[in-house]
Amino acid sequence: MSKRQGGPMGGGPHGGMGAGEKAKDFKGTIRKLMKYLSEYKIGLIFVLLFAIGSTIFNIAGPKILGKATTEIFTGLVGKVSGSSGIDFEKIAHILIFLMCLYVTSAIFSFIQGYIMTGVSQKLTYRLRKEISEKINRMPMNYFDTRTHGEVLSRVTNDIDTLSQSLNQSATQIITSFTTIIGVLIMMLSISPLMTLVALLILPISLGLISTIVKRSQRHFKNQQEYLGHVNGQVEEVYGGHNIVKAFNKEADVIKEFDETNEILYQSAWKSQFFSGMMMPIMQFVGNLGYVAVAILGGYLAIKKTIEVGDIQSFIQYVRNFTQPITQVAQVANMLQSTAAASERVFEFLEEEEEDQFAQNPVSVEGLEGNVEFDHVHFGYNADKIIINDFSAKVKQGQKIAIVGPTGAGKTTMIKLLMRFYDVNSCAILIDGHNLKDFNRGELRQMFGMVLQDTWLFHGSIKENIRYGKLDATDEEVIEAAKAAHVHRFVQTLPNGYDMELNEEASNVSQGQKQLLTIARAILADPKILILDEATSSVDTRTEVRIQKAMDNLMRGRTSFIIAHRLSTIRDADLILVMKDGDIIEQGNHEELLKQNGFYAELYNSQFEKTSA
């Protein structure tokens, strides 16, 4: 399970993202994030104003509280000396004013938090929407070389990490720097000498922060990356758990998962360890400054240079001064997490897209469905060509069968026909027009597909059949189901056509899934049909019934059929026999048997197996 074999149509290169991903571009990622945030600048301006206002009111508190302390101390001294007592009325006024400041600060803090949450959620919504739209524009090669879980991790884990860390870090950046500046001003107004002593802790703090951030940066990156790998493995194994059990591969799967999970554990442990180190180290450094200021303040009070209330205010300011420094360390940590998640999201959004529109698009209206392969060369990698100089002309209404052993290039031909991949050289033509001259969406509307891997979504049977033609009436849906010989089966189900299929459509059999996908293709009424192992998952009796229905459907339409059971394509107008990417034989069934070549060998070997 360690390597994925292409996409749902098979073929394609192996792949997956590894640990060799490019190094983090922290500054570039933050610039991109700021560009996104600039669209919410009005909200961010209000966040800035309310955060600054809340912080300023909070900063003023210790200074005012110091006045109350001074008033109490003066009153006590006066009472001892017999001159006067404590002025409780004045103290009450000071405390009421102080309470009003703190209440206002709390209200401002609530408002800025409310606005910032809205901004971060709007950004999250936008990024999820862009990723969802981006997925539909991505080339098939991207999904053939990555696990589903890795892509899903960008939409879920990375976006959630970005939203949460942004919501916290943006506000803390504002409040931390405002607090540092405001507290510094208040400290200088009380005592420049005490301020100088308090500032001596800064070089130590900054040095420790810088060291820890540098060490934690790469671990946060690895944590996000391998979280995607773990999700991909879980999704892959869960989707194929029956196969895993059938081949007794539980131990191998667990071993592979443990290896990836171990890397994730180590990265997460180290990143969280360094993150957790910041707070106790910064608190220790802050306490050193606190002790130094307390000693100096007592000395200055004895010298009557400052008042007792100023000492209390200054000590509280020292505590408030070290707290935002600690918060800056936490913000630096969160910014690393934000940048790591943002980079993965932006990397996905900046992936190369398919060209959806041609410069001078050809209209699909009135096209008949003649197809020509003109000396086609193709390889998933430029240095490994798997289709060499393939040429064939298919007239409208013909039934074309493509046969050959596994890996011969049969499914690849279909991918090229639908422009999931572009040819390396020469061209594929429809009614004389190069496929590249069509808009991709309009081109694919010409095709109806019944794939080997049936795909049905969570919804009613009626909705699944109607997927090929959303404006189809209920009567048209039923007629398509009858043509696919699935109508009688649907009638036996609870709620009939309104029965809900579960997430993996496991409440119907594989053969019934195949019939429903055939009904969907019939309803779409395409000009060109692609049948990839269309009847390989049903019993012989059902296969015969489906074959008759498909013969009626294919009459008058260009049809491409990929099948390993050669008995199903004996009436094909043209059979292309592929081996190692080349067409080595072509003709109808009788002609190919007379040639007594590779096709005859394949056909006779299947006949012998059937007889045995």
Predicted stretch roles:
Residues 34, 42-67, 98, 113-117, ...:
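Alpha-helical segments in transporter systems
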Residues 357-358, 364-612:
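ABC-type nucleotide-binding domain
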Residues 44-108, 189-193, 304-308:
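Transmembrane helix-loop-helix hairpins at lipid-water interfaces of multipass membrane proteins
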Residues 39, 43-56, 101, 168-222, ...:
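Transmembrane helices of ABC transporter permease
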Residues 20, 29, 37, 116, ...:
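Juxtamembrane loop-to-helix connectors within ABC transporter transmembrane domains
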Residues 39, 140-141, 159-166, 170, ...:
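An intracellular "coupling" helix at the cytosolic face of ABC transporter transmembrane type-1 domains
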Residues 186-200, 270-343, 348-349:
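Helix-loop-helix
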